[in-house]
A protein has these predicted regions:
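Cell-envelope and extracellular/periplasmic
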Residues: 1-226
Length: 226
């Protein structure tokens, strides 16, 4: 609210407000984890608003039909591991062996330090997290697709069409997985189109602005160029 009312910045937010209040759209709806409703502020992390507000406003202004945003986002999840899609398979066996060894060493060290007897991780434990966020995301998408009329009564009876997919993740892939990012992204796009039965589904890959006006370099540059 401070930026929206401050003289030096309020013009940036003027199109999102009316009568000194945040606009609540009646033509754009959003589902974000446990929250759902007409698009307005508050659909980011607790007490915050994310890119969905501006994006949804642009989409709502462009389309005559109502718009639903299905936001499935979990911070700190990489495409290499948690968002890894089925056709990408698992990393090379040597990488999994290395991960298993490190996990077992951590548990053994913690057991010794705290006089505990926790079981050492198995290869099954190591493999289980791979693709978990992809599976959760697809379950979230399909739940909204199947139950949009119940979640948003104003849209009851209307046929829902999946019109596009926006990817705004990848920060964590710069920490050792940048060279696999391009391959994993190709698998990701292919699998989503297959799972949603939408072979020509448009994809938009957004770039984050943490570096401000400074160009990306190193691992992040590799990811952006993928």
């Amino acid at each position: 609210d401070h930026q929206a009312t401050n003289a030096s910045t309020k013009e940036l937010f003027a199109h999102l407000r009316k009568d000194d209040q945040w606009i609540v759209r009646d033509d754009v709806f959003i589902k974000f984890l446990e929250r759902k409703g007409p698009l307005t502020v508050g659909y980011g992390s607790p007490g915050r608003t994310g890119p969905e507000l501006e994006f949804g406003t642009v989409m709502g202004n462009y389309f005559e039909e109502p718009v639903i945003l299905i936001k499935a986002a979990w911070g700190g999840h990489s495409l290499y591991k948690l968002f890894r899609s089925p056709s990408a398979g698992f990393p090379a066996e040597g990488e999994l062996d290395k991960e298993l060894k490190q996990a077992q060493e951590r548990v053994a060290k913690n057991n010794e330090k705290n006089k505990k007897n926790d079981p050492l991780p198995t290869m099954e434990d190591i493999k289980k997290p791979y693709g978990s966020s992809y599976r959760n995301m697809m379950a979230e998408l399909k739940d909204v697709i199947d139950n949009s009329g119940t979640m948003f009564p104003a849209l009851k009876g209307r046929k829902l069409e999946v019109a596009g997919f926006v990817w705004f993740q990848g920060w964590n892939d710069q920490y050792g997985a940048e060279n696999e990012y391009e391959s994993n992204m190709k698998h990701f796009i292919k699998d989503i189109r297959k799972d949603l039965n939408a072979p020509k589904l448009p994809f938009v890959i957004a770039a984050m602005g943490q570096n401000g006006s400074k160009p990306a370099k190193g691992a992040m540059l590799i990811i952006q160029q993928a």
